[in-house]
């Protein structure tokens, strides 16, 4: 007997075929686009190095929803619960502070062995891993400078941390058969009027060159650098600005990270993708939702998320753009936050794949902007939800909001016991 979902699917196939879209091919393409989930949503960026310490670096996780992960086992269990509710390929993005060791490890001494459990877990769950050095929440970052620090010994500490992190990243790629994207973000900047804006950038330039001096297999490891407009306590000057890192990534041919919350509120990263791709080999995206500032709210299926996805698909950037998420909301159930944000990113990608882009390009090239706008708007009414629901069914995940029941059950059975 044909189910309601199957009936809707068959009708959707016909509707999309009428405008030249093969929905089966769209689903195949969607499975080529993994989304890298960020581990730090699960514990408010606490990590395991000093979980009771303060979060610094001009970033904030606001809220105090009960049940946050307190150790690696709890965090992995929470991630597994979230991933069961998200269809399609996924990766996990780790920060260096999520190492596991029985004894304290200085950040400039981290080694692959400190992340062995993560690798074994990733193998068991068929995941790729990505990585980040953690240049914040540390005594040697307390004055607001790391890789651009004027003190040679402190700057060298952070250089060594980033070099050690690259080796961890390469280990991930070698073990898992998929390259690890390692993103360098630093909080360096000043609160008030800065007289010498050049010297810190000169130091950062030299430091980064030393960091990436060791040649690593690009099949295992990809370097990325990330700019930011400002942070709390660094409102007036950020060393690693957009211009700095665009120049660095272009001249050194590293990947460039574009974070949706790291620009002026009137700027959008969807418009930056096609420009940056002319100069850099690869892009890393941190899809987020800034509310008035880099607040890292949970990603919505909104215009900008859709525009980001559409840029990737329209320009066939599957092999040059790495999609990551970066938000941390401690005011709601953290597992639900992962599920909502990641599903929304995947929905946006699917919608982009269901767009009649070839026809739209023809209209645009012909100068028929009336028809272009009309078709762009009319295609929004096509039965995309039926295609999404079939995709979820094929990946054995809930199609609609019933996933929330699973989260609530997990919260009652597991999270509520954490205190």
From Swiss-Prot:
Which key words are in the record?
A: Cytoplasm, Isomerase, Manganese, Metal-binding, Rhamnose metabolism
- What is the UniProt remark on how the cofactor binds and its stoichiometry? Binds 1 Mn(2+) ion per subunit.
- Annotated Pfam families: RhaA
State the similarity comment.
Belongs to the rhamnose isomerase family.
Q: Check the record and name the Gene3D superfamilies matching this protein.
A: Divalent-metal-dependent TIM barrel enzymes
Fetch the NCBIfam families from UniProt.
PRK01076.1, rhaA
Keyword set includes Chloroplast: no
Its needed co-factors are:
Mn(2+)
Q: Name one GO molecular function term.
A: manganese ion binding
What is the superkingdom listed in this entry's lineage? Bacteria
Q: Name one GO biological process term.
A: L-lyxose metabolic process
By its UniProt entry, which InterPro entries does this protein fall under? L-rhamnose_isomerase, Rhamnose_isomerase, Xyl_isomerase-like_sf
Which residues are recorded as binding Mn(2+)?
Answer: 262, 294, 296
| Pathway(s) this gene product operates in, as recorded in its UniProt entry | Carbohydrate degradation; L-rhamnose degradation; glycerone phosphate from L-rhamnose: step 1/3
Instruction: Please tell me whether the keyword Membrane is annotated for this protein.
Output: no
Q: Where in the cell is it found?
A: Cytoplasm
Q: Which reaction does it catalyse?
A: L-rhamnopyranose = L-rhamnulose
Its taxonomic placement starts with: Bacteria, Pseudomonadati, Pseudomonadota, Gammaproteobacteria, Enterobacterales
Gene Ontology CC terms: cytoplasm
Q: Under which name does UniProt file this protein?
A: L-rhamnose isomerase
Under the subunit heading, UniProt states: Homotetramer.
Matching entries from PANTHER family are given as: L-RHAMNOSE ISOMERASE
Query: EC annotation?
Result: 5.3.1.14
Q: What is this protein's function per UniProt?
A: Catalyzes the interconversion of L-rhamnose and L-rhamnulose.
């Amino acid at each position: 007997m044909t189910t309601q979902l199957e009936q809707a699917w068959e009708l959707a196939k016909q509707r999309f075929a009428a405008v030249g879209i093969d929905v089966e091919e769209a689903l195949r393409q969607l499975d080529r686009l993994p989304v890298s989930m960020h581990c730090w949503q699960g514990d408010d960026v606490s990590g395991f190095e000093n979980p009771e310490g303060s979060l610094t670096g001009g970033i904030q996780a606001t809220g105090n929803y009960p049940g946050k992960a307190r150790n690696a086992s709890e965090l992995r269990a929470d991630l597994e619960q979230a991933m069961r509710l998200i269809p399609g390929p996924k990766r996990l993005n780790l920060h260096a502070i999520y190492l596991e060791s029985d004894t304290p490890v200085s950040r400039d001494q981290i080694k692959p062995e400190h992340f062995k459990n993560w690798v074994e877990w990733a193998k068991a769950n068929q995941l790729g891993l990505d990585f980040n050095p953690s240049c914040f929440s540390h005594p040697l970052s307390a004055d607001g400078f790391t890789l651009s620090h004027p003190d040679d010994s402190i700057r060298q500490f952070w250089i060594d941390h980033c070099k050690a992190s690259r080796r961890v990243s390469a280990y991930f790629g070698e073990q898992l058969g998929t390259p690890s994207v390692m993103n360098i973000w630093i909080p360096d900047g000043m609160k008030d009027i800065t007289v010498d804006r050049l010297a810190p950038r000169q130091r950062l330039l030299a430091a980064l060159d030393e960091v990436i001096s060791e040649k690593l297999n690009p099949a295992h490891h990809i370097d990325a650098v990330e700019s930011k407009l400002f942070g709390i306590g660094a409102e007036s000057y950020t060393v690693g600005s957009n211009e700095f890192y665009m120049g660095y990534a272009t001249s050194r041919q590293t990947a460039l990270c574009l974070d949706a919350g790291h620009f002026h509120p009137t700027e959008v990263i969807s418009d930056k993708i096609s420009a940056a791709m002319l100069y850099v080999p690869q892009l890393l995206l941190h899809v987020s939702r800034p509310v008035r500032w880099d607040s890292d709210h949970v990603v919505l299926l909104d215009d900008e998320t859709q525009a980001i996805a559409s840029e990737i698909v329209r320009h066939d950037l599957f092999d040059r753009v790495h999609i990551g998420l970066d938000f941390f909301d401690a005011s709601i159930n953290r597992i639900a936050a992962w599920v909502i944000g990641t599903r929304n990113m995947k929905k946006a990608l699917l919608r982009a794949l269901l767009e009649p882009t070839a026809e739209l390009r023809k209209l645009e090239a012909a100068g028929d902007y009336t028809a272009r706008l009309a078709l762009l708007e009319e295609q929004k009414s096509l039965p995309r939800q039926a295609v999404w629901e079939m995709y979820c069914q094929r990946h054995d995940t809930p199609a609609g909001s019933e996933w929330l029941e699973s989260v609530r059950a997990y919260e009652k059975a597991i999270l509520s016991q954490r205190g």
